[in-house]
UniProtKB/Swiss-Prot annotation:
Residues 263-317 form the PAP-associated domain. It catalyses: RNA(n) + ATP = RNA(n)-3'-adenine ribonucleotide + diphosphate. Pfam families: MTPAP-like_central, PAP_assoc. The lineage of its organism: Eukaryota, Fungi, Dikarya, Ascomycota, Taphrinomycotina. Disulfide bonds: none annotated. It comes from Schizosaccharomyces pombe (strain 972 / ATCC 24843) (Fission yeast). Keywords: ATP-binding, Cytoplasm, Magnesium, Manganese, Metal-binding, mRNA processing, Nucleotide-binding, Nucleus, RNA-binding, Transferase. It comes from the Eukaryota. Mg(2+) binds at residues 106, 108. InterPro entries: MTPAP-like_central, NT_sf, PAP_assoc. Belongs to the DNA polymerase type-B-like family. The gene is cid11. The keyword Nucleotide-binding applies. This is Poly(A) RNA polymerase cid11.
């Protein structure tokens, strides 16, 4: 099919700006670093056992893994069918590929054009996917990395797609390699990711916190700085072969990791203590690349803006992954680490995990219509603990476009699609067609049998009228 070039993308949207997660006036940090969390071997074993149980509930089922793969295969088929250019390729990155995905995580896909002239914008990609029945399409072309957000009703998969962001492939390989070194890494990663999601800590664009990739790097660096270390420095994993990025043989790294006998449950408590009390936010930089904690002054980041938390990007050391969080947000993050540590120290094994992952409730809740269905299998993660948690899938963090009711175009010829943009300062009643005719702002022809371009309704304040059996009832986005 011929991909159109848009002057104004009909799928254009933007990340929903939600309420800030942390209020600077409400965040209170604990000054004391006294540890009162000594646990005996029995309690340690119970906590570790509960961690493994939660991990088994959080990781995607075989059925979900299969659906994800079928969805990716479908995307490949769409590209090869409609854009017959051998230069185009796609790869999956992020949590799906690095083995840190929890149930109902989005699938992240990057399309590599390799100089192809047939696909050069996210708006063109959105148009192509719309023609293949993808729903809830939002094109965010003005983001630092432009993306297209979609939902495939066939496989019930939410997906974020970008074009030519190939650095994501390297980051994904790095995390996947770290996860494969020690069997404690993946359970820790999934539990911490779930905790961060429940506590609304990984929404950099929406509420000024950090990304899940950033907190994964913080976990890796925590494990690198244990004594003895569980994970090596990233530089130690780099290959001398110019044709590949990382080494293939990691047996030696696995053997070194076994020298650290700390249990899974103990590591989880230590992680929260480390970033709640021990880590020096004022002077330190998390460095996965070196496997150490760098000095902020020596790195030249002491005077940078939004540097209260510094997490070095492993492959672009000039970039701070945590610069999405300002000073109040970083203090809020630290307070959440402290809260988790306190709760992990005060309760029995079952209650510890249940309490730290209680869902954070914003005081000013956005209209629930924007958030998708929360009655999902993911809500059963804590079923055995007797906890009532509401879990939102990743894609539920973004509002869904308004979709008018489906109609069937009448047979024969072309039809006009008319839309009305109301003047909100002089809102009036539109109970009959006569009142609307004088206010029509524009129209576009539709070929008989084609679907009306519902995505030409990017904001909820538009009123739409279209030819149907009941012309007196326009679809309203209000």
């Amino acid at each position: 099919m011929e991909l159109l070039t848009f002057t104004c993308c009909p799928f254009e949207g933007q990340m929903q700006q939600k309420k800030r997660r942390f209020d600077a006036n409400l965040v209170q940090l604990q000054e004391s670093e006294h540890r009162n969390d000594q646990i005996n071997e029995t309690v340690d074993a119970e906590l570790t056992n509960e961690c493994w149980k939660l991990y088994m509930r959080l990781k995607p089922s075989n059925e979900e893994v299969s659906r994800r793969q079928q969805f990716v295969d479908k995307l490949r088929t769409i590209l090869s069918t409609e854009i017959k250019d051998a230069k185009l390729d796609l790869f999956v990155f992020g949590s799906t590929e690095n083995n840190l995905a929890i149930q109902q995580s989005d699938v992240d896909v990057c399309i590599i054009t390799n100089g192809s002239k047939y696909l050069n914008s996210t708006c063109q990609l959105a148009q192509l996917l719309y023609s293949y029945g993808m729903k809830q399409i939002v094109c965010v072309s003005r983001a630092r990395v432009p993306i297209v957000k979609i939902w495939d009703p066939q496989f019930d998969i939410h997906c974020d797609l970008n074009i030519n962001n190939d650095v994501a492939k390297i980051n994904t390989k790095m995390l996947r390699l770290f996860v494969s070194i020690d069997p404690r890494v993946r359970p820790l990663g999934l539990i911490i990711k779930y905790w961060a999601k429940q506590r609304a800590l990984c929404d950099a664009a929406g509420s000024g916190t950090i990304t899940s990739y950033t907190i994964s790097c913080m976990l890796v660096n925590f494990l690198q700085t244990r004594n003895p270390p569980i994970l090596p420095a990233m530089l130690d994993l780099m290959s001398n072969d110019d044709n590949k990025m990382f080494v293939d043989d990691i047996v030696g790294f696995k053997e070194k990791a076994t020298l650290n006998k700390t249990s899974l449950g103990r590591l989880l408590i230590d992680f929260f203590y480390y970033y709640g009390f021990s880590f020096n936010y004022l002077d330190s930089v998390v460095s996965v690349r070196s496997g150490t904690v760098l000095n902020k002054q020596e790195k030249g980041w002491a005077m940078e803006v939004n540097n209260s938390l510094c997490v070095e990007e492993p492959f672009n050391t000039a970039r701070n992954l945590a610069n999405t969080a300002d000073n109040p947000s970083v203090k809020g993050l630290q307070s959440e680490f402290q809260r988790a540590f306190r709760l992990m120290s005060e309760n029995n094994a079952c209650e510890r995990l249940c309490k730290i992952c209680e869902e954070y409730q914003f005081l000013d809740i956005t209209n629930e219509a924007n958030y998708g269905n929360t009655n999902t299998p993911f809500n059963t993660a804590y079923e055995s603990f007797g906890c009532n948690h509401t879990v939102l899938p990743e894609a539920a963090a973004y509002p869904k476009p308004y979709y008018p009711p489906q109609i069937t175009l009448s047979d024969g010829g072309n039809m006009n699609f008319l839309y009305y943009i109301p003047d909100e300062s002089n809102h009036q009643s539109y109970e009959n067609k006569a009142n609307r005719d004088s206010d029509f702002q524009g129209q576009t022809s539709l070929t008989q049998g084609s679907a009306p371009p519902w995505h030409y309704i990017p904001c909820q304040s538009w009123l739409v009228w279209y030819p149907s059996e009941d012309a007196s009832n326009p679809a309203s986005g209000n």
